[in-house]
């Protein structure tokens, strides 16, 4: 499964985006994430809509990738900005097609929550 959304972001560059996208900030940026149980910069544990999960944070050339390494669907979320464009991309993938409608809806809500969070950082 793959979802891609874009958010207008004329006031946010890659450096500020990377600084905002920390594990500790996840509950503030995405309402589907309830709290951070542990944060060790590049890895941590969160409690979210899908329960407790280990999360990894990887710095990319133009953004950040969060992955859920123990998730049975290998969910990843990349949030990137091309400084030549005034848009932030929110890209979510799983390692297989998802047929469970409730899970699909929860992923769609996860992305909607990220859009809201990114918009608050941009303004």
Set out the residue ranges of the language-model regions.
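Hydrophobic-ligand-binding modules of eukaryotic lipid transfer/binding families
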Residues: 1-6, 89, 99-102
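Hydrophobic ligand-binding cavity/cleft-lining segments
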Residues: 1-44
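Short, highly charged low-complexity linear segments
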Residues: 8-12, 47, 78-84, 109, ...
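Short, low-complexity, polar/charged sequence segments that are solvent-exposed and flexible
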Residues: 24-29, 64-68, 84-87, 108-113
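A short, polar/proline- and glycine-enriched secondary-structure boundary/capping micro-motif
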Residues: 29, 57, 76-79, 100-105
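Hydrophobic-ligand binding "helix-grip"
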Residues: 44-85, 93-95
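N-terminal secretory/membrane-targeting helices
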Residues: 86-91, 121
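A conserved amphipathic terminal alpha-helix motif
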Residues: 95-123
